[in-house]
């Protein structure tokens, strides 16, 4: 979410017309309004552009606009449901308390399934499964600190939530006969251990 900033050299600086920039208070209220509306399968990655203050002519000068928006939400008695605000990170949560949730919605000619393990409002792990002509896992993530492949430990990433989500994806995609996964180079070995094979830009498993 990037409120407009007027920077040096921009065409708007020479001809602003009726444009009036947001100040920090107004911008925080607008961002808080948007955060109230965001569904739980959306991630708000960034709020406010990271532009050096000396280059800004007009607009929000505070780089911590997200904190201002959170303060405004707290004042309203509301919370943001976006992924970024619900991830576990360093919170102490027992994965055994996780509840499986599935939220489905139509998008771009197909059906998206956001399948997650949650404890209260905290998000422990999630997967995005898309059904159109094929079944595709577009994203799989276990929140918290990253776990090295094969390592042992007690954190969220060591409880097999990712593998459980992949098993659920396979069950949901059974009618398609196969499941493909968008993957990164560093996760190829992980998917191979789950029975997937490299096929072009995806890893694929017959069902």
Where are these regions (language model features)?
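Conserved beta-strand-loop-alpha-helix junction that forms the acyl-donor binding cleft
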Residues: 180-189, 207
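Phosphate/diphosphate-binding loops
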Residues: 17-35
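Conserved, mostly hydrophobic/aromatic
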Residues: 44, 137, 184
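Conserved GNAT acetyl-CoA-binding A-motif
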Residues: 171-183
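Conserved acetyl-CoA-binding loop-helix of GNAT-fold acetyltransferases
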Residues: 153-172
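Conserved active-site alpha-helix within GNAT-family acetyltransferase domains
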Residues: 185-202
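Flexible glycine/acidic-rich beta-alpha junction loops that bind and position SAM and/or redox cofactors
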Residues: 1-22, 41-67, 142-152
């Amino acid at each position: 979410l990037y409120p407009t900033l007027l920077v040096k050299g921009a065409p708007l600086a020479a001809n602003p017309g009726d444009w009036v920039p947001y100040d920090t208070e107004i911008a925080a209220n607008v961002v808080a309004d948007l955060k109230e509306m965001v569904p739980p399968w959306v991630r708000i990655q960034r709020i406010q552009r990271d532009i050096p203050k000396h280059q800004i002519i007009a607009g929000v000068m505070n780089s911590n606009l997200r904190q201002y928006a959170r303060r405004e939400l707290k004042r309203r008695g509301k919370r943001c449901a976006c992924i970024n605000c619900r991830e576990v990170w360093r919170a102490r949560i027992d994965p055994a308390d996780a509840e499986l949730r599935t939220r489905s919605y139509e998008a771009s000619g197909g059906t998206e399934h956001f399948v997650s393990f949650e404890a209260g409002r905290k998000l422990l792990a999630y997967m995005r499964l898309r059904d159109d002509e094929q079944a595709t896992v577009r994203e799989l993530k276990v929140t918290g600190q990253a776990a090295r492949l094969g390592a042992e430990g007690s954190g969220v990433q060591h409880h097999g939530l990712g593998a459980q989500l992949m098993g659920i994806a396979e069950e949901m995609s059974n009618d398609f006969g196969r499941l493909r996964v968008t993957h990164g180079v560093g996760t190829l070995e992980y998917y191979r251990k789950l029975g997937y094979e490299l096929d072009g830009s995806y890893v694929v498993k017959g069902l």
